[in-house]
Structures are given as C-alpha cells and as structure tokens.
Curated annotation (Swiss-Prot):
Entry's Gene Ontology cellular component terms: protein-DNA complex
Organism encoding this protein: Caulobacter vibrioides (strain ATCC 19089 / CIP 103742 / CB 15)
Database matches in PANTHER family: LYSR FAMILY TRANSCRIPTIONAL REGULATOR, TRANSCRIPTIONAL DUAL REGULATOR HCAR-RELATED
HTH lysR-type domain residues: 1-58
Keyword RNA-binding applies: no
Protein family per UniProt: Belongs to the LysR transcriptional regulatory family.
Keyword Nuclease: no
Name of the protein in question: HTH-type transcriptional regulator IlvR
CDD domains according to UniProt: PBP2_IlvR (cd08453)
InterPro entries in the record: IlvR_PBP2, LysR_subst-bd, Tscrpt_reg_HTH_LysR, WH-like_DNA-bd_sf, WH_DNA-bd_sf
Disulfide links within the chain: none
A Pfam short name: HTH_1
Gene Ontology terms for molecular function: DNA binding; DNA-binding transcription factor activity
Amino acid sequence: MDIRQFRHFAAVAETLHFGRAAERLGITQPPLSQSIQALEKALGAPLFARTKRHVELTALGRQWLPHVLEALAAVDALPDTARRLRDGQTGYLSLSFVSTADYSVLPDLVRRYAEAFPGVEIQLVEATSDVQVPAIQAGERHAGIIIPPPNRSLPAALAYRRLVSEPLVAVTPEAWGAEGPLDLAALADVPLVLFPRTVAPAFHDLVTGYVAARGQPVRIVQEAIQMQTIISLVSAGLGMALAPASLRKLARVGVRYVDLVDPPILETGLVWRRDEAAPTLQGLLRLVTEDGSAPD
C-alpha cells in the first residue's frame, strides 16, 4: 500500500464513479481499477460493491474512509509544516532562567516571543546558572538566562549576550525601619540571607564583595537557592538580603526594599550554544538583537 492508492480510494469513495474519479485524478480508468483491486487485495477485503451501473462503499470502505481522508490531509500539510519549522514559526523553544530574572527580563522577553511566534511552544525551566550552563552545553536546552561568571568566563562553545544590568537594593525586615539610601557601613550588624556560592558564585561574590567593601564582616545566617525564598526568610526577620532592583515588583508583607549607597550592579544575560541551529532559537536571538546588545 502507498499514498497513491489512498488517493485513488478517496477519489472513488467520494464520487462513487470510477470514470469521474479517474478524471479527477488525471489518469485513465483501467489503472485506477487496477490500483483499487491491488489495495483491496492487500487489505484482504473489498472496499466497494460493484455492479455494471452502480458503485457503493462496503461497510469496511465506509468506516475506513474518514481515516484515509485524515491521513491524506496530514500528508498534504507536511510541506507547510516543514516550511513553518524551517522558519521557526512552529516547534518548541526550551528556555531556562534564574529566579532573579522573574521580575526583570523574563516576562517581557517571553511575551514578545509569544507574540512574534504564536505557533511555538515555549518550555520554561527555572534553574540556577551552574545547572543551566552544562545543560545548554549538552543540548538539553536551547538557551538560558543566567548571571554570568566573573569576566563572563564561559566555555568556548557557548555564546553570551547581555540582557540587562541593574543595581542591587537592600531587602530588610519591615521592623528594622530602614530608610534609603542605606549605607551598610553605618549598620551595627549585617546578617545576610544569600544564595550559596556553589550555585551562584557571581551573585554571591558580588554581594559579599560589596558588604566587605563597606567595612562590614560577611556574616551569612541563611542560604536559599531561589530569590523568592530569600525574600520570605527576610520577611521572617532572619536577616537582610541584597536583590536586583526589579524585585521591588515582588510585594511581600514584612519586607522593605531600600536603595543602597553606591550599589553594586548585577548583570543578567542570555547564553546558548554557538552551533545551535534550531530555528526557534534563531527567532529568539533576532528579538534579543533588536534590543541593540552585541554577543560575546
């Protein structure tokens, strides 16, 4: 059996006339009759009941016809599907992201991508930068939004593009009554709630380096791997945190976001494999390029 025989069957089933079906198909009647006979032989049952004046579908033919028409429609759609896949208009995009991107670049980037490519399924995975980089290298993700390591020292196989740079702010328990701009040097104690260095070395070093530069000892009282959890621990009064200014959008009872004196700047960017040719990724890169940043 082949697709040609299915088209022959559908034409005869829809016209119930071998002559008209042959005319529709652009062939003569004898080859059409032979094709149907071969199909019936392969199936081991007749599809049509024939008389000299009349052709009608058998019970098998009537029940099989919808399946054949569905299969033919799917086959006919394959060229357009291939073109849409080639152009990145369909398929999927797998994008990982750090929790700090939830309130900065991620929502706008995803919204713009969904508007530009509504036929693409966006698969989002939250993960720390240290988890994202090897996953992207292994081809498990198309791209990731990360906090880059110092000096952007990423593997040579990966490309990187800065998305945003923003100041850090102090996140303090409401009960502290802190007002900005806050100078950590003026505080009696700076108990920190922070990412573990093993999962976020760049962010960890940025925070601890700033605290030390303001003349305070680095005292970490709690660690968590998600920024939302860190904010919750601050609201519980366990300490203070430094967070991207965009996290002000995360309203949480019991915390206060306070500007810092000479705040450190946190960079967030997009990373992907240089040899990754997925059309859906290329669409994302075109959107990012429109923002005017250059890849490293």
